[in-house]
Regions:
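Short S/T/G/P-rich N-terminal loop/turn motif that feeds into the first structured element of a domain
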Residues: 18-200, 204-226
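Bacterial N-terminal signal peptides
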Residues: 6-16
């Protein structure tokens, strides 16, 4: 099943050790290099899957940033993938590096990299686009932020959304809503904006002391999926 893992080493000890985990790398694409970046990452994904055993998703957001997501069954599999990458000198890997030599300016530059714990996966095979909201939890409030996010899942999915939630070790919680296309997403937004259930849930949370702040919204189109 295709899975989109929204943008998250967090809850390493508080979540189940069997939870799926992963690594997210964000690459800022040089202006005018979008097609080259897409071609390079599309070609590289199956090579990395073969070497590391990870399920890989790759997408691009509205900021021309590549989201490269490697997902593993658990932390042991994550560690084995890292060991394999460090030890592997396959011909395919070498050929790919040779095909895409360094350029000036570079095609893309690494902007961020972090580990994830998946709290909830989405349930669709047609998650081609995602709206991802990054919530920065106040100190000591990450668990509460996750609990609040989980309250929205049945409400949003009842309206046709497909939700994934993940978290990192910096207090961030990522809430991703995925659809087959942008038109479906737009229709869902209109329905959600008019929903009394959504409004009621927001109202109940707004009566409490805020535990997190929405700091970024990513609109991602996925062009590589497992």
């Amino acid at each position: 099943m295709k899975k989109i893992y929204a943008l998250a080493f967090s809850l390493l000890f508080t979540l189940s050790a069997a939870a799926e985990v992963g690594t997210v790398s964000l690459w800022q694409v040089t202006p005018g290099k979008n097609q080259e970046a897409i071609a390079r990452t599309t070609a590289f994904a199956p090579i990395m899957e073969e070497i590391t055993g990870a399920q890989i998703s790759v997408g691009m957001d509205q900021f021309n940033t590549i989201h490269w997501v490697q997902v593993y069954e658990d932390w042991e599999a994550w560690g084995k993938g890292g060991d394999a990458l460090g030890q592997n000198n396959s011909e395919k890997f070498a050929e790919h590096i040779a095909k895409y030599p360094r350029t000036t300016p570079p095609i893309m530059t690494l902007a961020d990299r972090f580990e994830l714990n998946l709290v909830k996966m989405n349930s669709t095979d047609n998650a081609n686009v995602s709206w991802i909201t990054q919530w920065d939890s106040r100190q000591g409030q990450q668990q509460t932020t996750i609990a609040n996010a989980m309250q929205f899942v049945p409400v949003h999915e009842k309206l046709g959304g497909n939700i994934a939630i993940s978290a990192d070790n910096l207090g961030n919680v990522y809430y991703a809503n995925s659809f087959e296309n942008w038109a479906d997403m737009g229709r869902w937004i209109e329905v959600a904006n008019a929903s009394k259930d959504v409004a009621t849930l927001w109202a109940s949370l707004l009566t409490e002391e805020p535990v997190a702040e929405a700091v970024k919204h990513y609109r991602v189109r996925w062009f590589v999926q497992p």
